[in-house]
A protein has these predicted regions:
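Acidic, mature catalytic/reactive cores of soluble proteins
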Residues: 301-320, 324, 353-357, 375-378, ...
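Non-transmembrane amphipathic alpha-helical segments
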Residues: 496, 569-572, 576-579
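Extracellular/oxidizing-compartment recognition motifs
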Residues: 1-426, 438, 454-455, 474-478, ...
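Active-site acid/base region of carbohydrate-active enzymes
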Residues: 130, 142-147, 151, 366, ...
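Acidic/polar loop patches that form or flank catalytic/metal-binding clefts of enzymes
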Residues: 108-109, 117-120, 140-144, 455-456, ...
Length: 796
């Protein structure tokens, strides 16, 4: 029998069928364990091992978790990583099914613990360093931590340093091969010590006297994609005399062109590369695309040689006087620019075929390799990437005559992949945090591309569980550094509404409604006697408009903002639809009463009759597209989107501009704003940016939303009600005369092929079984039925 291991996702508590009294309910037969000399005073890497001998071929299911993160090895082969990111009240464990042959085996977990300090990941919650493994069935006594004789050893060679500019992402790894415990993955070496039990293990079934440690729950997501990539090309090879290269501009006169073929061979997985003794080399590698990946290098000889691998999204242009933020210019260009990045360093021990890699992945398009050798040449046997992100399988696709929309697909899908891991992320290079405002747009794009909604569910659930005493969600979660952006709580209500439309899970939506009401109540408390919402305490961010203060429009911080008032009204109306749709008409009536009262007050206070638009502030000194968008989304139709001198929506908020444009028949505005994304292609971007140039981040998935709008706005495919049990197709093709598309649906897939000739639509629409709908073209409608439908509507 050959050993096999498989990660599985389970839905239920694995030990929930054990009959226990209320004081012990949820207890596991395993305990959390710890190295006897590692208490959490500083970063540590600890290996845990359990050596066993099986008398017969065996299958067993095990559940594994750690604080902070683990890698799990079976007989020296890595079988998984974890624990999936969550918080202490919902600490995830992974489940593995093992098929083992008779004979000796060794399980080893390598557990990293950085701690809650300035170099730690903001998104990584921690209690204290610990490891847990629980087996089901008869092998529990043989394998469970706290019961079986597990051993541990602290691994040498690791140093964790600041991520520098990539703040909030996690410490970077310095690994000294001479001090490293090679072979520990196989259980080899000495200095193993008996572990100590530090806490009983409990699940969320615990009902009384709950723990102050980790409340266990099953992992919600599958294993992340990890696939090897041999990619990239050496754009610049340089002889250097210092390892401090941050201000060393790339100059073609310094380029060692004759060394490029050898580096390119290494990068493609072809041959090894030897760096001579007493040499310093700097190589800038263009990966050709944006990657999130573990860099993996195998080294031989070259005792005490150093290999530093840093990552950057782009190189930087020279500093400009009086401007603290450096520009990047065309992302394809490197000449005259500086490489300012972050990454990991490996110091080789001189032995053969040593494999080095960091404990967390890196991100970017460009890699700077700096190699420094001593008295012995260094052989780089292999250099590759282990690409890492959520394992999407995209089935949504479209074809349109617009080159801009065609070019958008690789950029938008790539940025979504790069910002999707164990949570969604705002950006993989900097904070790696799941922000509500970003996530709503990422999730909508996900709905259009795949029927896999596990990551959207996790996001909605974790935000719900992040709510504090005020009732508002955290702006970003999980995060050990709390942050409150009140408008983001309103977007979370929008996420629940979106899920209710695009997916079909009544129980999940109903479970979120108490949280929806809590958010609305927190805002309602700030509505004054006139009916206007006064600023809610927190960072009232709306958009990265360049002349706004920290993304806040006029009076958003301490006064009364027209934009945020309309945003609240828009959210109240979505909440009322949810309440009606899920059986609570009384709550729906309450939400509508408040929305109507506020809309009347906001119209009086902010409508500017001379300009024919809503003001951002009570003094009518500031005007924006943002106020008009939220007014339209809240039901107002007297305003307009094309008034002169409005503060313009950036790449993020343009989603709401496109939503509003759809409602008022101004689809021309969507096509006009596509130049934001065309600019990205012209300037060498592989992913969408965070904000107007000079942008901090080159990879922000809130900029993927035009992909969603191609399906939902231009091709016009939208749910006609909750559960997507019927569909409303109302295409607004703008200057395009045809379009084809397929999107996933809870009951299968939905596809269409449309052609417009002199205002008349023809084509085919195919709906899943059990799904009906309506096709609209102006005032004309055609009923749609399950299966194939042939169109024939005339119109404008």
């Amino acid at each position: 029998m050959k050993n096999k291991s498989q990660r599985v996702v389970i839905q239920e508590e694995p030990f929930g069928n054990v009959v226990q009294n209320p004081f012990n309910r949820g207890s596991w037969s395993a305990s959390w364990v710890q190295h006897p000399e590692v208490y959490g005073a500083g970063p540590a890497v600890v290996a845990y091992r359990r050596m066993i001998t099986l008398e017969a071929d065996t299958t067993v299911r095990i559940h594994v978790s750690a604080d902070e993160r683990y890698e799990l090895f079976l007989d020296g082969e890595r079988m998984g990583r974890g624990s999936e990111r969550g918080d202490r009240h919902g600490w995830f464990f992974e489940t593995y099914d093992l098929s083992l042959s008779a004979g000796p085996h060794v399980l080893v977990a390598r557990v990293f613990w950085i701690g809650a300090d300035s170099i730690s990941a903001h998104a990584q919650i921690t209690v204290r360093p610990a490891f847990l493994l629980a087996a089901e069935g008869d092998l529990a006594a043989l394998w469970n931590t706290g019961a079986a004789p597990w051993e541990a050893k602290r691994l040498g060679g690791y140093e964790f340093v600041s991520p520098d500019m990539a703040w909030g992402t996690s410490a970077k790894t310095v690994l000294r091969g001479a001090d490293y415990d090679w072979g520990h993955e196989c259980g080899a070496g000495d200095s193993w010590q008996v572990v100590r039990s530090i806490a009983p293990a409990y699940s969320a079934a615990r009902t009384c006297m709950g723990p102050n440690n980790w409340m266990l729950r099953p992992a919600m997501l599958p294993a992340m994609l990890e696939e090897p990539r041999w990619t990239g090309m050496a754009r610049h090879v340089q002889v250097i005399d210092t390892e401090d290269t941050s201000d060393l501009a790339v100059q073609s006169v310094d380029h060692c062109a004759d060394e490029v073929p050898s580096w390119d061979q290494l990068l493609s997985g072809g041959t090894s590369l030897t760096i001579p003794a007493n040499t310093k080399r700097r190589v800038i590698v263009d990966l050709g695309n944006y990657y999130c990946a573990y860099p993996v290098v195998t080294l031989s000889r070259g005792k005490a040689a150093t290999m530093r691998i840093r990552w950057a999204e782009s190189l930087y242009e020279p500093k400009q006087p009086g401007n603290w933020q450096r520009s990047k210019g065309n992302r394809d260009e490197i000449e005259g620019k500086s490489f300012i990045g972050t990454g990991d360093t490996f110091i080789h021990d001189g032995e053969s075929n040593r494999r080095y890699e960091p404990f967390w992945w890196e991100a970017g398009r460009y890699v700077e390799i700096v190699v420094s050798t001593g008295n012995e040449p260094l052989i780089i046997e292999n250099f590759h990437l282990l690409e890492a992100h959520y394992p999407y399988v995209f089935s949504g696709k479209y074809e349109v005559p617009s080159q801009e929309l065609t070019d958008l697909v690789p950029l938008a899908t790539r940025v979504l992949e790069m910002c999707s891991h164990e949570t969604y992320m705002d950006c993989p290079y900097y904070e790696q945090l799941m922000y509500v405002g970003d996530t709503r747009l990422e999730v909508l794009t996900t709905y259009a591309l795949t029927d896999d909604d596990r990551l959207p569910r996790k996001a909605i659930l974790l935000y719900d569980e992040s709510r504090g005493p005020m009732g508002l969600t955290q702006a970003r979660y999980p995060s050990r550094v709390p942050q409150l952006i009140p408008p983001f709580s309103l977007y979370w209500v929008g996420m629940v509404h979106d899920f209710a439309l695009w997916r079909d899970d009544t129980a999940f939506v109903r479970a979120r409604m108490p949280g929806v009401r809590a958010v609305l109540d927190a805002f309602a408390q700030r509505v004054n006697d006139v009916g206007l919402l006064e600023a809610v305490q927190g960072w009232n961010f709306v958009d990265w408009v360049p002349h706004w203060d920290a993304g806040m429009p006029a009076d958003a911080d301490f006064g009364i903002s027209g934009i945020i008032n309309w945003h609240f009204i828009y959210t109240l109306r979505m909440a009322a639809e949810l309440e009606d749709g899920f059986g609570e008409p009384e709550f729906a009536a309450r939400d509508r009463r408040l929305a109507d009262r506020m809309a009347a007050a906001v119209t009086v206070a902010f409508w500017d009759s001379q300009r024919g638009v809503y003001a951002d502030d009570l003094a009518h000194q500031h005007f924006s597209e943002h106020a008009q968008c939220f007014a339209i989304l809240a039901g107002d139709r007297q305003t307009r989107l094309d008034a002169p001198d409005l503060s313009r929506a950036t790449i993020y908020f343009s989603h709401y501009l496109f939503e509003a444009a759809r409602l008022v028949g101004r689809i021309d505005l969507l096509f006009e704003r596509l130049d934001l994304w065309s600019y990205l292609k012209r300037m060498g971007f592989k992913t969408a940016v965070e904000s107007p140039e000079p942008s901090r981040s080159d990879c922000h998935a809130w900029g993927a939303h035009p992909l969603y709008h191609t399906f939902a706005t231009l091709l016009g495919i939208r749910p006609a009600g909750f559960g997507f049990q019927s569909v409303r197709i109302e295409p607004q093709l703008g200057p395009m005369e045809w379009g084809r598309g397929t999107i996933p649906h809870p009951r299968g897939s939905l596809s269409l092929a449309l052609k417009r000739t002199e205002g008349r639509f023809s084509g085919i629409i195919e709906l899943p079984l059990g799904v009906s709908g309506t096709f609209l073209n102006g005032a004309q409608t055609q009923k749609l039925y399950p299966g194939k439908n042939t169109l024939g509507l005339s119109g404008n």
